[in-house]
Regions:
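Generic N-terminal amphipathic, Lys/Arg-enriched alpha-helix
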Residues: 1-17
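Generic secondary-structure signature for well-ordered alpha-helical cores
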Residues: 14-21, 34-42, 97, 124-127
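Electropositive phosphate-/nucleotide-binding environments in soluble metabolic enzymes
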Residues: 2, 6, 23-27, 41, ...
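N-terminal low-complexity or amphipathic/hydrophobic leaders
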Residues: 13, 25-72
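A glycine-rich, acidic short-motif signal
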Residues: 50-162
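A structured, mid-to-C-terminal "fold-capping" secondary-structure block
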Residues: 170-175
């Protein structure tokens, strides 16, 4: 059976809306899943793994815990990046548009791989991103150059320096 990208997006938007996601949030979440799936990051498998959790918890947004000149800390309150990833990327992007560079740590969040789509989309505004997170027994580093349509995806084993459920993002005009 063949299904178009538009049909997948429409179905996922309805599914996320049924889970309690707000307009805008369910658009972004559907985009994240489809982008990962169409670019070889197994978006549907990742969604299936988290669906039970999403179905049993109310959607919550991240809280700003700390802010200084170039750094932010957001608390995801145990939610998925499908819900709080867009606001994290929008926050760091808006800070970089006003200055030179910024860093953001999103703590207490899950499904961090979904952030890749948001970083790629934001990179289309000539911004560069580097993101780090821990995934099971390894760490992931994603680099996105300004204007890039695909990330550079690397894994490494420095587990002790990356918290289990956190995501670190750095953004600038070039990194």
């Amino acid at each position: 059976m063949k299904v178009s990208k538009n049909e997948l997006l429409a179905s996922l938007k309805k599914a996320f809306e049924a889970l309690g996601f707000q307009p805008g949030d369910y658009y972004d979440a559907a985009d994240m899943v489809v982008w990962l799936e169409t670019h070889g990051f197994y978006g549907f498998d990742r969604l299936l793994a988290v669906l039970t959790y999403l179905n049993t918890t109310a959607p919550v947004h991240a809280d700003l815990m700390q802010e200084d000149t170039h750094n932010f800390v957001l608390d995801g309150k145990g939610t998925s990046v499908l819900l709080c990833g867009s606001e994290a990327v929008d926050l760091i992007r808006s800070k970089v548009m006003k200055g030179s560079c910024a860093g953001l740590e999103l703590i207490n969040c899950y499904n961090r791989t979904f952030i890749v789509q948001r970083l790629i989309k934001a990179a289309q505004r000539n911004l560069a991103f580097i993101a780090y997170w821990r995934q099971l027994d390894y760490c992931v580093k994603v680099s996105v150059k300004p204007g890039a349509h695909l990330p550079e995806y690397q894994t490494f084993t420095m587990l002790e320096i990356v918290d289990l459920q956190s995501l670190r993002i750095f953004c600038g005009k070039n990194l």
